Design a protein with these regions (language model features):
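Conserved HGGG/HGGXW glycine-rich cap/lid loop of the alpha/beta-hydrolase fold
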Residues: 11-63
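Active-site loop/oxyanion-hole signature of alpha/beta-hydrolase fold enzymes
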Residues: 40, 52-93
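Gly/Ala-rich beta-loop-alpha elbow adjacent to hydrolase catalytic centers
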Residues: 94-98, 102
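Flexible "cap/lid" loop of the alpha/beta hydrolase fold
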Residues: 103, 107-108, 113-144
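Conserved alpha/beta-hydrolase catalytic His-Asp/Glu region
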Residues: 127-131, 145-200
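Short beta-strand/loop motif that positions the catalytic acidic residue
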Residues: 204, 210-212
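Conserved alpha/beta-hydrolase "acid-adjacent" motif
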Residues: 212-213, 217-222
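Catalytic active-site module of serine/aspartate enzymes centered on a nucleophile-bearing elbow/loop
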Residues: 224-259
Length: 259
């Protein structure tokens, strides 16, 4: 695995590259409060292609950001990383925040993407009591371990946390390393600020496949082939075999487009 850091408008972005052949690579983007280890069970042997794993801004080995930002900035970050790596076309697999970024990037730059995997993707604007709950939760980020423990309970199913309590512990460890202001900015940019993306799904011209968990809080995205799998919002941890099949399906869509 080759690792490097790429300068972007959202700080230094850590990238790990699992090289495997000369076909169009697969790029992986994780969700909030996770890192590229989300994809540990999905090496390049799965697709026979090079896999590029990105630590999202202010997550994993990527640096803090230091200023307010938006999902549009994430799109620019992704395109910047691809440009720096010399990747003109790719397949992108996104989880949650990563899929929100992938959708917007594929809509804005459709020629750069052969297919997109939209896994556990929130696409409706956070509103009502849910929005109020996230606003109140922001007050807890000054206690990152406590906040992360509560976040894990809402993101993972109860069953998987009983089987793998380490998932909650690792989330607590990750958030405890970040300034509370950075965590607060993530909540704003990814959860509170995004507008409804339904129209983007209707106008998407890139082949796409979606996956959601049975107890996931996100709905079924319109006009997109969707698989419902066991578990909650973090399907790559909770439904490994189903996620592997979903990744292969996205690659199939890309191959069909190229044929």
């Amino acid at each position: 695995m080759r690792e490097q850091r790429i300068t972007s408008g959202l700080g230094q972005i850590a990238v790990a590259i699992d090289e495997n052949g000369a076909q169009i690579p697969v790029v992986f983007l994780h969700g909030v409060f996770l890192d590229r280890s989300l994809w540990a069970d999905y090496g390049s042997d799965l697709t026979g292609r090079t896999h590029i794993y990105i630590d999202m801004p202010a997550h994993g080995n990527s640096s803090d950001i230091g200023h307010d930002w938006s999902l549009d900035d994430c799109v620019e970050m992704l395109i910047n990383v691809l440009d720096e790596l010399g990747v003109q076309e790719c397949i992108v697999i996104g989880h949650s925040w990563g899929s929100m970024t992938a959708l917007r990037a594929a809509t804005k730059f459709p020629t750069r993407f052969k297919a997109v995997g939209l896994f556990n993707m929130p696409f409706k604007r956070t509103s009502g009591l849910s929005r109020l709950g996230f606003i109140l939760q922001k007050l807890m980020v000054i206690f990152p371990r406590f906040y992360a423990k509560q976040a894990a309970k809402s993101l993972y199913s109860k069953a998987v946390l009983r089987q793998r309590p380490d998932l909650s512990t690792k989330m607590q460890d990750r958030l405890s390393k970040r300034p509370s202001k950075e965590i607060s900015r993530v909540i704003d940019a990814v959860i509170l600020d995004p507008t409804d993306a339904t129209q983007l799904l209707h106008t998407l011209r890139v082949p796409a496949f979606a996956m959601i968990g049975e107890t996931d809080y996100v709905g079924n995205p319109p006009k997109i082939e969707t698989a419902t799998v066991p578990g909650g919002h973090i399907s790559p941890h909770e439904a490994v075999q189903e996620t592997r099949a979903a990744i292969k399906r996205v690659v199939e869509l890309a191959s069909a487009k190229s044929a």
